[in-house]
A protein has these predicted regions:
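Long, low-complexity, Lys/Arg-enriched
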Residues: 1-54, 65-117
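Active-site-adjacent beta-strand anchor residues
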Residues: 57
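Short beta->alpha connector loops
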Residues: 60-62
């Protein structure tokens, strides 16, 4: 059985659990951690202590970037499509349906200073 550490304040959807089973071709045990985190380093430490072999993280892009670049982790990312049709979840008046998981290999943030008009 594949053990996966799930870092999100949102519980996994049935469609997400089924997709993980399909991807890994075995049953999965999710260790769900809904607790807030202060940094990518804290997520990495909690994941390593969990004994899990994979990781799903719902976090800001800057945190995902640090997980990859500073902690050497490549978490799974749940792709959600904003749509009312077939929606599985509603958050603050917006509707979403799970699409697939992708592995985070890198995150590139391009930022520029804001110039006054």
């Amino acid at each position: 059985m594949k053990k996966i550490y799930w870092v999100s304040r949102h519980a996994p959807l049935l469609s997400q659990i089924n997709e993980l089973k399909r991807i890994f071709k075995e049953d999965v045990e999710l260790i769900i951690d809904p607790e807030p985190f202060s940094s990518a380093k804290e997520i990495a430490e909690r994941y390593k202590r969990s004994g899990c072999s994979d990781l799903v993280v719902v976090a800001p892009l800057s945190v995902l970037q640090k997980l990859v670049e500073e902690e050497g982790l490549h978490p799974l990312y749940a792709v959600m499509i904003e749509t009312k049709e077939g929606a599985e979840v509603e958050v603050k008046g917006k509707y979403y349906r799970f699409s697939c998981f992708k592995r985070v290999k890198g995150v590139k943030l391009e930022l520029e200073d804001i110039q006054p008009p």
